[in-house]
Amino acid sequence: MDEDPEEGLLGWGETVFRDEHVFEIDYVPEVFRHRESQLQTLQYALRPAVRGSRPLNVVARGPPGTGKTTAVQKLFGELSGQPGVQTVRVNCQVDSTRYAVFSRVFEEIFDYEPPSSGISFKKLFGQVAERIADDDEVLVVALDDVNYLFYEDEAGDTLYSLLRAHETQPGAKVGVVVVSSDLELDVIEALDGRVQSVFRPEEAYFSAYDRAEITDILRDRVEVGFREGAVAEPVLDAVGGRTDEAGDLRVGIDVLRRAGLHAESRASKTVEMEDVDAVYEDAKHVHLSRTLAALSDNERALVRTVAEQEGDRAGDVYDVFNDRTDLGYTRYTEIVNKLDELGVIDAAYEQRSGRGRSRTLRLTHDSEAVLERL
């Protein structure tokens, strides 16, 4: 008997996925592996909130893609079911000023946005503090990617306002979870003395997953997100290896999603290595894509200029950048420093023949990959 040429092919209404949302960035897994000690630290710090007391503050730090945000989301999900506790997670990539942070907190507490203009920070802050005191609630705020507040020199004032809320409004109880992926940033040391004196956090370090842990976590996603048998163990193991090389779990999760879509484009019921190979180049830049997407127009303009003037002195890059944006040198330097801290560019001092030491700007990623994502 001849083999059926359509065997192993998807029908029009079929998919390799059981639940595609499993591979989205906001998905919180039911099973959260290899982070038991970090969760215990967070639970220890936040447990007083359930009893109506001010929780301990926490710094959660570690490389990108190591479960920090997921840990916070899981605990906040548990706390949200407790009476008298209000949790707010702020994405500091998006809300990178003190005013923006408190606007986000206001929106979560009141269920509507504050006026877009005409309301001072003092009034905004006062309304937030008064509301939680009047409702006798404990407010727990997570500043996710807090490094962005530091890049904008907004971290100290933001934390100070949150942690001193009880002085402005008696009865206001606020705890803060600070999440940072910048390993060169010492959050506590970077704060001035007035903030350090009231912050005094517990610390939870999220180390990079090893290859076995990565494969465990990806296997959980495959079992929940794909149809049975869609991803064979050798393919999963290969994705785990490439994820380990990339050093970011999110790369592996994105590879699985893209590979599944690629398999569907071939009408295949299974994800093969050819699908992984076809999508890996795009998926491995997932962190770069998100970083670039969060930049302002002027910051993106500077990235583009550095790509075009690769290896030029900072002064020469500024001349081109200034022609395009009209920004002054002080603001230019601030943007250079931010992009350097984000790991988008390398702004190093080098010895130049006959010119002494000067700052040279280079991209830290392949220029073609950067320009494609701007």
Swiss-Prot record:
Gene deletion effect: Not essential for normal growth.
Listed Pfam families: AAA_16, Cdc6_lid
A GO molecular function held by the record: ATP binding
Keywords assigned: ATP-binding, DNA replication, Nucleotide-binding
Residue positions binding ATP: T66, G67, K68, T69, T70, Y209, R221
Domain of life: Archaea
Gene Ontology biological process terms in this record: DNA replication
Gene3D superfamilies: 1.10.8.60, P-loop containing nucleotide triphosphate hydrolases, Winged helix-like DNA-binding domain superfamily/Winged helix DNA-binding domain
Similarity comment: Belongs to the CDC6/cdc18 family.
Function: Involved in regulation of DNA replication.
NCBIfam families: orc1/cdc6 family replication initiation protein (TIGR02928), PRK00411.1-2 (NF001624), PRK00411.1-5 (NF001626)
Stated name of the protein: ORC1-type DNA replication protein 6
Originating organism: Halobacterium salinarum (strain ATCC 700922 / JCM 11081 / NRC-1)
